[in-house]
């Protein structure tokens, strides 16, 4: 009988109460072992060297060396633990997204200081994300891209002949940063994105992607028009559906269907794209856990469209792309660094 070693976890938080609660929650989960706690960034780096944890749960706002400083210090080590950020939406959302772009694998939304007793409610989500992180592959964060140069005149754009829809989960902020930073300002198709991320963070994701991208990136609002030069990111907590009226395609936000495991759902976005754009849709499934996107990829293929998947070699978690590929729905696959060439081949 094979004995499976427990996942070794180090809890990092400057709040003694948070350290206590997170330790209790994680220690009570089967297959997890909390090997230590750290009160700040420097303490965390010392404990990482001493205890060799598999996963770090990381607070971001700490005295001295903060969470981003810890991530930067760990970035040079291939043996570094995987990081799950435990952060509050609102003022910390920008920091949390920066941490995901810098290599953190997962994000758990922590209650604000006024509701610390609700930390116990994080249990199931935190345990699941620690387990996901333990199986993730470390990928170097993308090189900081120069800020897109402002153009003195608007880019002349023809009406879109294709639509690109993208679905991703674990590792998604890193992957989207790398992909979008490579797209030229005259990329001919509008893009719609569905990213699994806790509620309250997509506005910050859109802002940070916009800073790295020659295209304009927006958090979806109901009625926003999709057009070439524009990237629309589904708002966390709601589905993004696409509605076409002749040459005009609009974003629609909706909680229905409620039965889906994720809001936004990649399947819901892809299925609406297949209905509205038919054979002119290119669906792209990037790194992520689970199988969200399989039903949507099937709808795109049945409509005559194209489905591309990220290769295992560049995925943080090869779950969603694998599920699509194993279902026989992938038209083609490529690592992230080859995805722009693949898009150019399939986008008109």
UniProtKB/Swiss-Prot annotation:
Domain CheB-type methylesterase: start-end pairs: 157-348
GO molecular function, one term: protein-glutamate methylesterase activity
Alphabetical list of Pfam families matching this protein: CheB_methylest, Response_reg
Catalytic activity as recorded in UniProt: [protein]-L-glutamate 5-O-methyl ester + H2O = L-glutamyl-[protein] + methanol + H(+); L-glutaminyl-[protein] + H2O = L-glutamyl-[protein] + NH4(+)
PTM description: Phosphorylated by CheA. Phosphorylation of the N-terminal regulatory domain activates the methylesterase activity.
Keywords, ordered alphabetically: Chemotaxis, Cytoplasm, Hydrolase, Phosphoprotein
Enzyme class: hydrolase
InterPro entries in alphabetical order: CheB-like, CheB_C, CheY-like_superfamily, Sig_transdc_resp-reg_Me-estase, Sig_transdc_resp-reg_receiver
Hydrolase in keyword set: yes
SUPFAM superfamilies attached to this UniProt entry: CheY-like (SSF52172), Methylesterase CheB, C-terminal domain (SSF52738)
Keyword Protein biosynthesis annotated: no
Subcellular location: Cytoplasm
The EC number(s) this enzyme carries: 3.1.1.61, 3.5.1.44
Active-site positions on this chain: 169, 196, 292
Comment, domains: Contains a C-terminal catalytic domain, and an N-terminal region which modulates catalytic activity.
Functional description taken from the UniProt entry: Involved in chemotaxis. Part of a chemotaxis signal transduction system that modulates chemotaxis in response to various stimuli. Catalyzes the demethylation of specific methylglutamate residues introduced into the chemoreceptors (methyl-accepting chemotaxis proteins or MCP) by CheR. Also mediates the irreversible deamidation of specific glutamine residues to glutamic acid.
Name of the protein in question: Protein-glutamate methylesterase/protein-glutamine glutaminase 5
Organism: Myxococcus xanthus (strain DK1622)
